[in-house]
């Protein structure tokens, strides 16, 4: 499922392709690209839930705004998000790429993924997808994109 999300983000969203794509055509395109129908369905459902945030159909969790508060992760969240992932989320909060609401959206979308393995690189892409879809997060998206691509480009040299 995550591979389908990455393919969609890179092909349609990140490359600024036409956003109004018929779901049946999209499913055919993804099937032709070699993805399994179940993974396609799960990825599209995941994106629909993300779009609910964008359209205001789902309110993000209302949290205390005390800057000294610390997020305590559940056991299930700790299984999916290892220490490096949780540290990266905290880092993004500290540099104000994520706020309390977007952090919770990211965690919710990570937990909704149907994947056995999840790494820091995967988290970075989920964060990018969430920020891209949330109105008012354009600057945070740009910062995250710069962080993601500067680090990856630096590794090529």
UniProtKB/Swiss-Prot annotation:
Organism: Enterobacter sp. (strain 638)
InterPro entries hit by this protein: Smg (IPR007456)
PANTHER family hit by this protein: PROTEIN SMG
Taxonomic classification: Bacteria, Pseudomonadati, Pseudomonadota, Gammaproteobacteria, Enterobacterales
Listed Pfam families: DUF494
Protein name as annotated: Protein Smg
Family named by the database record: Belongs to the Smg family.
């Amino acid at each position: 499922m995550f591979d389908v999300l990455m393919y969609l983000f890179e092909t349609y969203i990140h490359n600024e392709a036409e956003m109004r794509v018929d779901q049946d055509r999209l499913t055919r395109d993804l099937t032709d690209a070699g993805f399994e129908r179940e993974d396609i369905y799960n990825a599209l459902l995941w994106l629909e839930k993300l779009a609910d945030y964008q359209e205001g159909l789902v309110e993000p969790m209302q949290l205390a705004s005390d800057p000294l508060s610390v997020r305590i992760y559940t056991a299930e969240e700790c299984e999916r998000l290892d220490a490096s992932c949780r540290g990266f989320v905290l880092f993004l909060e500290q540099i104000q790429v994520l706020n309390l609401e977007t952090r919770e959206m990211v965690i919710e979308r990570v937990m909704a993924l149907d994947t056995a393995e999840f790494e820091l690189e995967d988290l970075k892409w989920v964060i990018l997808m969430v920020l891209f879809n949330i109105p008012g997060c354009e600057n945070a998206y740009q910062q995250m994109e710069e962080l993601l691509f500067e680090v990856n480009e630096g590794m090529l040299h």
